[in-house]
């Protein structure tokens, strides 16, 4: 979203003063200042003669006599930021964190400082955000940086910078709720502290985090408590931007899976509503502009996102700002999204706009040149008319082609409009235009001057000034033109120097007779004051004024808008006088009108149709007791309400607010019937090939769209989940459909040839395009690839010289959805976009696997480029052959062959690939294969096939560290099939739970060729530990199983579930992304997994901790309404019955969906599992017959009302809080926290509705333990869990932070450990920051941060503890298990007095390997104890994470008295790492 303002900056240097030029008595008086550099950014303090200019090297200049004389602003260099809501206020952004503010139009300045550097960019955030009413309240936007990484820090002042306080960290922008002077005017029941309310966009993890929320506080976040903006009890997430438009707060949000943006609007900073857009394209993120708006509506231009020549659609909202109707399509805009739209200043309802007359051709690519025409509206955008100069159409240059500062066409001068353009059928280039003027607000126009000019208005419009301009600021001239009669006649005045005009400006209210011209001559620049005060001696009298009507109707009579006519007192055009009412802006007078239809807008639940009438937006709801019969009628809402602020007279006028009689056929559907509804559709096709177009959080509408391709190439589409279907009309058979990977609204259809189709509106309409070559026929090669952040960017793989399923493949790319193509590479295997904005990769990064010498018979190599291979190509691995590569989350993984070994490499930035270190003694042969399984928790799960005999494939699952460079063994002998699919599945939503099937007789399979026998395993701590699954105690009939166990599975008795390798549809899963904790699978109880035919159906409600049998035999399943409905149907056998459960599988009900038995091939619903509709895909009696049954559960009485979830009391109504268990750990902490989820109570008779934010804000962070750390760079995990330096490598340079960040005070010595990126743990064991050292030349700052202790303190610290320490050390050494000197990751210790987390071990008191270690550890002990006593328990690093200062024994010896202590750390930190001569390199 973009709110445009023209703020221009530059530089100048004052050189000398030129004497004033004495003009003739009938011309203006001109005074000149000379400059070496062009003066820029002139700013007038409103209602004063004070003007400021920005200068060279940020020097500022000031004039207090309307630009006649200038002086440097002493000792206050910087950039000027005016407060546009308080005309006397401005702030100077100065260097070196020193700034100045004025509140009296630069008469006095107040100096202030901010600890961090302020944020500033021309297109991005500004350093200061001003309050709409109180000039003393300012938000200050800063950032703190560590090396090249920066984060936002926001400050605020409420007393005009006398005091400055910190507001928030990690925000993405903060804004006052009262951000404009008129916000909340006339509103009732406003918050008590609305003037103090601040909204902030807050990202918990990264600036690109899709969970960005809009939070707010009325106490400046002083109590660390804040609330997030909600609608219907659900937080708005994915917030991108917020804008303050007159009386409106406008919020834009986005979500994964769609480019559609959601717009939310509030008029009171309390209640928010989602804006709906009718009659035009959907609003897409980054492609709409909020335009200049009114106090009673918002104007938005929504751009077409595909074309390099963008074109928009203009929408206008109702007074609530939530219902938008398209005014006109084809609005001209440029690539920066500036839009040719401007309202006429001071007059309601009139605006000028430029349209693209050939918009359809430009959008389709048939025309590369826009034909731009100008239009004007006199009725708030309801109708548009051409601008007329005589009988010719006039076209004017607008916002996309500015030539001066400020407004383009108009000023506060009533009714006077000027512009540069031409007559004819389209707008020509600026330099070919003339100057035109209108004195009746655009009704009629006349040519004022030949050629293009810059222009300005003065003395309330009685004076017009212009200077020749070529649009390039290069045309030298020594004269100006001026008119004293509204542009009818023009005179010229000589300038003292020949120069090119840069800016021509005057006071903001256009009441002055003095103008400022900034111009550039040959070698010199000028600031010229042009004063017309003496041109007319007479001041206008009352006879010289007219009562001018601001708007005229088609009959030339004064027109009404917002219930009144508008008039101005204006000087007559031919009066020979000046108004001379400086700083007195013209004020309109109004005359009330009788109410007409135009004074009403649509009320809630209604929208405008093409005839501008209000019609129901959906079904109406009658009063209780009405509409018992369909033929009845009832009195219902008219659909209209008077526009708030409209002051028309109702008496004698139209009143559309009265209720009207409506037919009952227009009402909402009847109450729930209690029945399940079924709709049947038959197709002719042997293959089942369907796809859902999923909805995202910000998707508008409520369709549930499915596309189906039949064997003959026909495409069928349903938008109501299979109740009704439409057949697509295409000229060629559809070969395949490809949904957009990152935008669920988009789908591509491919044919046998070059021709293809796309739809961006969920298959409502399709448009054709052509690739450069027919799509590839090479087996296994995908023909289309998409960019994750740019929905219109494509890579097309086309084939030439095809021989069967083998082609020479060429890759092409397009940035406009196939309108234009450019060649990437020849002889490719595959190409993909690898850049993503929330990762370290470049936006334009493309990876390709390319055959050597472009010959498909030769090996593939990996290449990449950031300029589409135009100039630069990076060849990775020195051109060695690669087996393949893949992109998983933030990782790019590649496999290469090195002799007899298969090697894996990983990159997170697309530039540098690091060799992945596999576990010791784990050799990966060249004949092995990789399968990348998952990387959702900042770790790569990799399956390495180490046994590849036909139909007996299996291997090992390895888990990487957070940068993919070091792997540990997760699970051996994991099953795989010949298609490279692996029996491994992460349970959705619930963190850390995964299931896998292993080959239990791996040795027999390897050495004796036996068939595989399987067992199922489950992990509850992200695949660090695995266990067999416990079987249910009883079967569904209440009988015991043949084997029994107590609490957990054994090799003789466990539950086993058929896995991923046996599924017919890879989209099926055992769990759901919205049904928290529910798992369903088909399997058996026993020592091994039996055949699928012998299996039964089992279900878990607690993420796999316990299971129960659902049905005897094997069933297919699907979750609906986020798990509140579970449907199962028999697999591979004829049936006419399905079963469903409304209580998470506790009880089941049978339902007969057909009267004849069919064999159900699949059961499906929307991928998010949020619908109450299902599709059963079945086979009937005749060959090739496919039957689709829509089964609709919305009529059930048990699902009639929507469930209630209140964030402030989440367990008060239909939900409860649930935390998953982690039985392989002593606590339920995983990744540093205990997760808490919202779950619907099984007994609650309601439906969930839209997807819930399942993860509760009640999440509890845990103290850090060893499980929250991994091995650091160049360290690798040992067999005992410790991290040791890789032989031959050195730790990363810890002093790099000092070199990269000049303000860094200290660095930490490497420990071998670093915190897991996903861990949110706090406190506890800080293993990554132990030994602190001062940066070079920062010794004093370091000592100030870590003060030492005196001699007496040392004596006390040594004398009293030494005896106890020695005794405890000896006792521990003799009694403990001897595991000194290591930190073990993922290792469980028995709970004992000396377990790793025992308090006696936590306090570092001489738990060491012998007497020498005890003695050398004493200084560390004493320092720790002393600092504990003094309270130095924690120091905060620049990134807000809790870190622990620490000193090694070496540091103590080298720097007596400058101890850096550690509190509550583990005994295992005290090892032998500092004895360099020792063989033991353990940490």
Curated annotation (Swiss-Prot):
The keyword Zinc does not apply. The chain crosses the membrane at residues 1348-1368, 1400-1420. GO terms for cellular component: cytosol; Golgi apparatus; membrane. GO terms for biological process: Golgi to endosome transport; Golgi to vacuole transport; protein targeting to vacuole. Functions as a sorting receptor in the Golgi compartment required for the intracellular sorting and delivery of soluble vacuolar proteins, like carboxypeptidase Y (CPY) and proteinase A. Executes multiple rounds of sorting by cycling between the late Golgi and a prevacuolar endosome-like compartment. It comes from Arthroderma gypseum (strain ATCC MYA-4604 / CBS 118893) (Microsporum gypseum). Belongs to the VPS10-related sortilin family. It is a multi-pass membrane protein. It holds the Pfam family Sortilin_C. It is found in: Golgi apparatus, trans-Golgi network membrane; Prevacuolar compartment membrane. This is Vacuolar protein sorting/targeting protein 10. Residues 1369-1399 are cytoplasmic. Keywords: Glycoprotein, Golgi apparatus, Membrane, Protein transport, Receptor, Repeat, Signal, Transmembrane, Transmembrane helix, Transport. BNR repeats lie at residues 376-385, 436-446, 482-492, 716-726, 1098-1108, 1140-1149. Residues 24-1347, 1421-1483 are lumenal. InterPro entries: Sortilin_C, Sortilin_N, VPS10, VPS10-sortilin, WD40/YVTN_repeat-like_dom_sf. Glycans are attached at residues 295, 898, 963.
């Amino acid at each position: 979203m973009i709110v445009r303002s023209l703020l221009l900056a530059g530089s100048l240097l004052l050189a000398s003063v030129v004497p004033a030029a004495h003009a003739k008595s009938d011309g203006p008086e001109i005074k000149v200042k000379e400059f070496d550099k062009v003066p820029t950014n002139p700013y007038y303090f409103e209602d004063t003669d004070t003007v400021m200019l920005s200068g060279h090297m940020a020097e500022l200049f000031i004039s207090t006599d309307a630009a006649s004389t200038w002086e440097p602003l002493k000792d206050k260099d910087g950039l000027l930021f005016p407060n546009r809501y308080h005309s006397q206020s401005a702030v100077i952004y100065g260097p070196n964190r020193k700034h100045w503010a004025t509140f009296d139009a630069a008469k006095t300045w107040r100096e202030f400082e901010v600890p961090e550097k302020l944020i500033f960019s021309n297109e991005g955030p500004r350093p200061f955000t001003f309050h709409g009413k109180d000039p003393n309240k300012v938000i200050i936007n800063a950032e703190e940086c560590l090396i090249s990484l920066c984060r936002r820090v926001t400050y605020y002042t409420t007393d005009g910078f006398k005091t400055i306080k910190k507001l928030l960290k990690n925000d993405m922008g903060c804004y006052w709720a009262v951000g404009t002077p008129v916000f909340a005017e006339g509103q009732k029941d406003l918050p008590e502290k609305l003037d103090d309310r601040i909204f902030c966009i807050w990202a918990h993890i990264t600036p690109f985090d899709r969970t960005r929320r809009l939070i707010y506080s009325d106490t400046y976040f002083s109590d660390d408590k804040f609330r997030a903006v909600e609608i219907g009890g659900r937080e708005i997430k994915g917030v991108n931007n917020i804008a303050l438009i007159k009386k409106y707060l406008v919020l834009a949000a986005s979500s994964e899976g769609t480019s559609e943006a959601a717009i939310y609007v509030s008029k009171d900073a309390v209640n928010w509503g989602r804006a709906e857009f009718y009659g035009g394209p959907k609003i897409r993120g980054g492609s709409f502009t909020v335009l200049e708006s009114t106090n009673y509506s918002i104007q938005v231009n929504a751009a077409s996102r595909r074309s390099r020549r963008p074109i928009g659609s203009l929408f206008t909202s109702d007074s609530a700002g939530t219902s938008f109707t398209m005014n006109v399509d084809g609005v001209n805009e440029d690539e920066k999204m500036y839009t040719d739209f401007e309202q006429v200043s001071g007059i309601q309802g009139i605006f000028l706009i430029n349209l693209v007359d050939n918009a359809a051709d430009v959008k389709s690519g048939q025309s590369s040149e826009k034909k731009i025409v100008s239009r004007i509206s006199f009725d708030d955008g309801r109708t548009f008319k051409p601008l007329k100069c005589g009988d010719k159409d006039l076209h004017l240059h607008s916002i996309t082609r500015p030539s001066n500062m400020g407004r383009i066409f108009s000023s506060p001068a009533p009714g006077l409009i000027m512009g540069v353009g031409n007559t004819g059928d389209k707008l020509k280039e600026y330099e070919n235009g003339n100057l035109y003027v209108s004195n009746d607000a655009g009704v009629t126009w006349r040519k004022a001057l030949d050629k293009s000019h810059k222009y300005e208005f003065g003395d309330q419009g009685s004076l017009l000034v212009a200077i020749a301009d070529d649009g390039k600021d290069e045309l030298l001239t020594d004269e100006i033109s001026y008119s004293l009669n509204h542009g009818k006649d023009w005179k010229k005045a000589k300038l003292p120097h020949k120069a090119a005009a840069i800016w021509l400006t005057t006071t903001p209210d256009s009441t002055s007779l003095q103008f400022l011209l900034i111009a550039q001559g040959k070698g010199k620049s000028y600031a010229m004051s042009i004063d017309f005060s003496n041109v007319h001696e007479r001041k206008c009298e009352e006879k010289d004024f007219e009562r001018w009507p601001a708007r005229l109707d088609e009959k030339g009579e004064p027109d009404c808008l917002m219930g009144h006519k508008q008039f101005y007192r204006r000087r007559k055009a031919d009066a020979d006088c000046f108004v001379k009412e400086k700083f007195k802006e013209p004020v309109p007078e109004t005359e009330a009108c009788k109410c007409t239809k135009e004074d009403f807008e649509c009320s809630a639940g209604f929208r405008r149709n093409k005839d501008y009438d209000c019609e129901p937006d959906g079904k109406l709801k009658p009063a209780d007791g009405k509409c018992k019969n369909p033929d009845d009628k009832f009195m219902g809402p008219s659909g209209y309400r008077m526009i708030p602020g409209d002051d028309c007279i109702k008496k004698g006028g139209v009143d559309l607010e009265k209720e009207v009689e409506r037919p009952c056929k227009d009402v909402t559907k009847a109450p729930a019937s209690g029945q399940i509804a079924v709709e049947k559709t038959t197709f002719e096709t042997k293959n089942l090939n369907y796809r859902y177009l999923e909805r995202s959080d910000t998707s508008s509408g409520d369709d549930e769209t499915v596309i189906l391709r039949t064997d003959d190439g026909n495409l069928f589409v349903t938008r109501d989940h299979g109740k009704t279907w439409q057949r697509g009309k295409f000229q060629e058979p559809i070969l395949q459909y490809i949904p957009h990977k990152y935008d669920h609204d988009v789908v591509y259809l491919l044919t046998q040839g070059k021709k293809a189709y796309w739809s961006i509106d969920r298959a409502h309409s399709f448009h054709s395009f052509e690739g450069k070559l027919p799509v590839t026929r090479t087996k296994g090669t995908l023909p289309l690839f998409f960019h994750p952040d740019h929905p219109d960017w494509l890579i097309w793989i086309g084939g030439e010289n095809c021989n069967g399923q083998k082609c020479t493949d060429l890759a092409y790319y397009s940035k406009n959805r196939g309108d234009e193509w450019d060649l990437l590479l020849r002889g490719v295997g595959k190409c993909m976009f690898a850049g993503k904005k929330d990762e370290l990769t470049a936006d334009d990064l493309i990876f390709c696997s390319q055959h050597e010498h472009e010959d498909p018979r030769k090996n593939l190599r990996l290449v990449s480029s950031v300029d589409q291979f135009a100039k630069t190509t990076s060849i990775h691995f020195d051109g060695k052959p690669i087996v393949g590569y893949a992109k998983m989350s933030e990782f790019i993984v590649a496999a290469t062959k090195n002799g007899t070994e298969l090697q894996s490499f990983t990159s997170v930035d697309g530039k540098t690939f690091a060799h992945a270190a596999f576990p010791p003694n784990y050799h990966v042969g060249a004949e092995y294969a990789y399968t990348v399984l998952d990387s959702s928790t900042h770790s790569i799960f990799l399956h390495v096939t180490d046994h590849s005999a036909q139909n007996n494939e299996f291997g090992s699952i390895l888990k990487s560290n957070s940068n993919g460079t070091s792997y540990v063994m997760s699970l051996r002998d994991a099953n795989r099939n010949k298609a490279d699919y692996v029996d491994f599945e992460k349970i959705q939503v619930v963190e850390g739970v995964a299931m896998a099937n292993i080959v239990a007789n791996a040795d027999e399979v390897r050495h004796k060729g036996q068939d595989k026998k399987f067992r199922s395993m489950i992990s509850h701590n992200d695949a660090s530990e695995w266990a067999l699954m416990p079987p249910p105690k009883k079967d569904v009939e209440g009988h015991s199983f043949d084997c029994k166990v107590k609490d957990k599975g054994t090799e003789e008795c466990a539950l086993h579930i058929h896995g991923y390798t046996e599924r017919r549809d890879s989209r099926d899963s055992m769990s759901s992304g919205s049904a928290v904790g529910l798992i369903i699978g088909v399997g058996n109880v026993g020592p091994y997994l039996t055949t699928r035919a012998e299996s039964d159906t089992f279900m878990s409600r607690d993420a796999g901790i316990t299971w129960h049998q659902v049905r005897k035999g094997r069933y297919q399943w699907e979750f609906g309404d986020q798990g509140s409905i579970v449907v199962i149907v028999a697999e591979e056998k004829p049936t006419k019955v399905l079963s469903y459960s409304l209580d998470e599988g506790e009880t089941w009900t049978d339902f007969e969906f057909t009267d004849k038995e069919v064999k159900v091939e699949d059961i499906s619903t929307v991928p998010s599992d949020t619908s109450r509709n299902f599709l059963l895909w079945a086979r009937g009696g005749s060959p090739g017959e496919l039957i689709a049954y829509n089964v609709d559960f919305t009529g059930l009485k048990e699902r009639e009302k929507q469930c209630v979830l209140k964030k402030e009391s989440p367990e008060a109504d239909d939900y409860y809080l649930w935390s998953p268990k982690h039985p392989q750990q002593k606590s339920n902490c995983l990744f540093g926290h205990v997760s808490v989820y919202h779950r619907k109570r099984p007994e609650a008779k309601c439906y969930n509705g839209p997807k819930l934010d399942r993860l509760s804000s009640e999440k509890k962070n845990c103290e850090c333990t060893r499980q929250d750390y991994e091995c650091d760079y160049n360290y690798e995990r040992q067999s005992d869990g410790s991290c040791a330096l890789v032989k031959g490598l050195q730790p990363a340079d810890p002093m790099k932070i000092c070199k990269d960040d000049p303000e860094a005070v200290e660095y930490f010595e490497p420990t071998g450990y670093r915190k897991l990126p996903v861990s949110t743990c706090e406190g506890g064991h800080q293993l990554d920051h132990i030994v602190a050292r001062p940066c070079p030349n920062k010794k004093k700052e370091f000592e100030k941060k870590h003060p030492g202790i005196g001699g007496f303190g040392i004596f006390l610290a040594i004398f009293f503890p030494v005896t106890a320490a020695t005794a405890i050390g000896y006792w521990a050494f003799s009694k403990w298990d001897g595991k000194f000197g290591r930190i073990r990751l993922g290792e469980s210790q028995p709970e004992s007095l000396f377990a790793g987390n025992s308090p006696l071990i936590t306090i570092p008191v001489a738990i060491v390997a012998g007497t020498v270690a005890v003695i050398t550890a004493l200084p560390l002990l004493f320092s720790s104890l002393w600092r504990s006593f003094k309270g130095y328990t924690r120091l905060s690093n620049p990134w807000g994470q809790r870190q622990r200062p620490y000193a090694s024994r070496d540091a103590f010896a080298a720097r007596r008295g400058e101890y850096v202590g550690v509190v509550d750390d583990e005994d295992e930190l005290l090892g032998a790492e500092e004895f360099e001569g020792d063989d033991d390199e353990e940490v």
